[in-house]
């Protein structure tokens, strides 16, 4: 299923490695206290999502990621040799001769910038959703790790493969986007147009359970045909008691904005959800820069290919973080950085940049990305977008020379750099594959 979803761009060796190692990492999570739903017989209550041929997804109600994070953080806090710096923001990686030696880090509360030197540095900075604005990602998903790595010439790959989750809750009165899990369709929910047509069978034999790229592209086509602002997820035929047991957060969130799932369809539309590309790494998480590692959504491991299979990201993060640890633990402790002396960070000015400039440019970027570099792209839009983003990038470089560093400005700078990587990759790719589609592209992955 992973290979099919990845549409020919998965690294088969990586796929086999993750699938083989996955059960051990799951057991480790459970040993650390993660609790996953079980059926009446005490076995895992396995869910099914788009692209999966079987029920195989271990979950915790409709908050699996939260439960995994809770268990890992609790375990981390138990370790005396782990120190967590809250309210600290990494600005730049420290590098010399293609080798990373740590990072310059901003204390958000004191505005002090410190040098965090390290023999090895691991980026686990998550996704890039805020580049689009209309996203299921949190506000901190500004692509910081990818941008920092790019600035020290680490190789990035396949940044054009942006996964749009097909069913984010549509609601005009809210700026944040709430995710309606694909497991709801696996549970039996139907996608419908405003007129009630179940349209997915027109696009894929798997219907509502097709992979995310196909469902998102199909919804995009339907909305452009009809002029409607959303489609609908129909759960009115499902057992409401069973639904609330499986999806309590989805039920309560819909109810809070006046949607009665038992009687009403849920308005949904695609939103940016996941970056399938990222910082290129090998099977030990090593980047092209010595002593720099990357893991999770900011990395490109070869697992997802052109499109991620639902729920594979959590598995990937667990397997690769463990492999990075095992690799580093096998190396002799040389403490190379102690002999190195790096200059302190110097701000060009004591004055902060006008926040309205940052907010305006960020909003303009998000509108541009949504409009010109969305689910379906074309070269004329991409070339126009590239020109504008390059202009903003040059403006950011000039601003940095004149003003004091702030987290908000650096997030904007990182978002613009990531947007450039996405648009360049989109222009260079000349075939439709997985989650990538250009309407003026005649060649497809299956046309060879």
Language model segments and positions:
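Glycine-rich active-site loop/strand segments that organize a redox cofactor
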Residues: 1-18
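A short alpha-helix-loop-beta-strand transition element characteristic
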Residues: 9-12, 26-43, 83, 155-158, ...
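Glycine- and aromatic-enriched mobile tails/lids
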Residues: 28, 34-55, 192-208, 219-222, ...
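Conserved redox-cofactor binding core of oxidoreductases
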Residues: 30-112, 117, 124, 168-172
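Alpha-helix capping and helix-loop boundary segments enriched in small/acidic/polar residues
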Residues: 63, 109, 113, 132-140, ...
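FAD-site-proximal beta/loop scaffold in flavoenzymes
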Residues: 92-110, 114-115, 259-301
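Glycine-/small-residue-rich beta->alpha transition segments that form the dinucleotide
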Residues: 118-120, 124-129, 298-299
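An anion/pyrophosphate-binding glycine-rich loop and adjacent beta-alpha core
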Residues: 148, 154-266, 318, 327-332
